[in-house]
Amino acid sequence: MSSQTLVAAGSLEEAIKEALVSSPKKRRFTQSVEMIVTLRDVDVKKPENRLNTVVALPHPAPGKLAKVAVIASGDTALKAKEAGADIVVDKDELQKIGNDKKAAKKLAKRYDFFLAQPDLMPLVGRVLGKYLGPRGKMPQPIPPNVALDALIERFRRSVRIRMKDEPQIACRIGVETQPVEHLAENARAVLAEILKKFPPPNIDRIYFKLTMGRPVKVSREVVRK
């Protein structure tokens, strides 16, 4: 089922507009627009009911692109640098990081997505697994013969949607300066991905809020149970 059949046309836009208008006075920084989806009748204690996936947004926020780290050696590392990866970590550097707990934590915190050369995945797991795993950031293996520049660009414009211990999913869909229509399209992309995992009866409520604003609920009348 698509997000369009779950939520009536225009309802997301209306809730986003209200969230923008009801936010406190202008801040000295550009506030993020966050989407919160609460679920019902989902047992989060069961691993199969948890969600950790990536959604490419149709309209990524200007100046808020995700940071992508590539772990690779040789030709793949060279291509990753040419493709503009935010950082490229080769095998030797990875092993050094493994002996530096502070550096490993910093790497895991600073970058949003990790891509790794397939033959380095076991080493990545041993060296960085305990730092990336709890954050839901374990690397994606780089497919053979992939256009690395396109792959990196896709992750740059993506957000991670993750549900762990609570039946709730929250992610940033943009910033307050973006057009409402763009924010709504981003929200629909996220909702469509959630619906691949959880059918409409499991969708309880949808909210939007700014960083410093109050949550605004999408009208219940348009969320079809």
Swiss-Prot record:
Keyword Ribosomal protein appears in the UniProt entry: yes
Keyword tags: Repressor, Ribonucleoprotein, Ribosomal protein, RNA-binding, rRNA-binding, Translation regulation, tRNA-binding
SUPFAM superfamilies in the cross-refs: Ribosomal protein L1
Biological process annotations from GO: regulation of translation; translation
InterPro entries: Ribosomal_uL1 (IPR002143), Ribosomal_uL1-like (IPR023674), Ribosomal_uL1/biogenesis (IPR028364), Ribosomal_uL1_3-a/b-sand (IPR016095), Ribosomal_uL1_arc (IPR023669), Ribosomal_uL1_CS (IPR023673)
GO cellular component terms given for this protein: large ribosomal subunit
Residues spanning the membrane: none
A GO molecular-function annotation: tRNA binding
Function: Binds directly to 23S rRNA. Probably involved in E site tRNA release.
Family: Belongs to the universal ribosomal protein uL1 family.
Subunit note: Part of the 50S ribosomal subunit.
NCBIfam families named among the record's database cross-references: PRK04203.1
Protein name as annotated: Large ribosomal subunit protein uL1
